[in-house]
């Protein structure tokens, strides 16, 4: 089972360890203690057509900027790691009653004026408005009945969206994260979720960025205290254990 650097590195005095990662009874080495799928959401960050399609505008923009190797790394990461692990994680989450959330970078404004300035040209060039094919979830994750969907105007899944309200209304206090890219939109989603008080997990092998070094750095930063670092297999096992206990 994967362990977070913060827990494994002995950062915490013993009297503080019970409050790490916003988990009331956190214990190092027991990542899934008191885990409840019914109070959990799986937030899929930017797993949408314009972001990860090999022929899509985001990959094209990375290549046009002179970084074909970074585009190739992300595509290979998706094909070899993210995609296969999502095939394990998503069905297990839906069976266990985990609420699947699609957090999608797209516009609801005719001139894309709702998008943060730094990202606006990319979203506009992609034609990523809410309802467009570009802004729809990729086929690998689907959009099943019962899934939630939020449209974000910037990097994080919480900023400018109703996500916090929707989760709290359902009594959800725990979040699993998957998506792209780990150093940007995923990282900022996790950071915001931590400050909102959610217990959090980064499903590391369901995330990807533009280089192996970037992925390593993101996992180290996130794992320090924002979220526990786990694998898809870890999460599936925890969900199945809870389902069988019912």
Where on the chain are the PLM-derived regions?
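Active-site-adjacent betaalpha module
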Residues: 1-41, 55-62, 91-96, 107-108, ...
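Short hydrophobic beta-strand that contains or immediately precedes a catalytic carboxylate
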Residues: 43-45
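Short acidic, Gly/Ser-rich segments with clustered Asp/Glu that frequently serve as metal-coordination loops
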Residues: 47-55
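Short catalytic/ligand-binding loop motif for oxyanion handling, primarily in non-cytosolic enzymes
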Residues: 52, 109-112
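A solvent-exposed, charged loop/short amphipathic helix patch at secondary-structure junctions
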Residues: 55-75
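Short, glycine-rich nucleotide/cofactor-binding loops
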Residues: 73-81, 176-183
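A short, N-terminal amphipathic alpha-helix
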Residues: 80-99
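A basic- and aromatic-enriched beta-loop-alpha substructure that forms the phosphate/nucleotide-
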Residues: 101, 105
């Amino acid at each position: 089972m994967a362990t977070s650097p913060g827990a494994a590195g002995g950062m915490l005095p013993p009297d503080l360890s019970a409050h790490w990662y916003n988990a009331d009874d956190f214990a190092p080495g027991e990542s899934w203690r008191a885990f409840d799928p019914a109070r959990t959401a799986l937030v899929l960050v930017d797993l949408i057509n314009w972001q990860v399609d090999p022929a899509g505008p985001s990959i094209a923009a990375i290549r046009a900027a002179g970084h074909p190797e970074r585009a190739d790394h992300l595509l290979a990461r998706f094909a070899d790691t993210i995609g296969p692990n999502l095939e394990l994680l998503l069905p297990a989450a839906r069976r266990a009653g985990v609420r699947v959330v699609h957090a999608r970078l797209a516009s609801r404004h005719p001139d894309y004026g709702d998008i943060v300035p730094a990202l606006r040209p990319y979203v506009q060039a992609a034609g990523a408005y809410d309802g467009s094919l570009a802004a729809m979830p990729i086929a690998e994750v689907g959009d099943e009945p019962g899934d939630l969907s939020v449209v974000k105007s910037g990097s994080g899944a919480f900023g400018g969206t109703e996500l916090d309200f929707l989760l709290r209304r359902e009594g959800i206090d725990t979040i699993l994260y998957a998506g792209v890219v780990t150093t940007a939109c995923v990282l900022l989603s996790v950071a915001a979720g931590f400050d909102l008080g959610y217990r959090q997990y980064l499903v590391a092998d369901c995330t990807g960025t533009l280089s192996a070094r970037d992925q390593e750095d993101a996992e180290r930063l996130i794992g320090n205290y924002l979220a526990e670092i786990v694998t898809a297999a870890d999460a599936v096992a925890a969900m199945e254990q809870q389902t069988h206990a019912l």
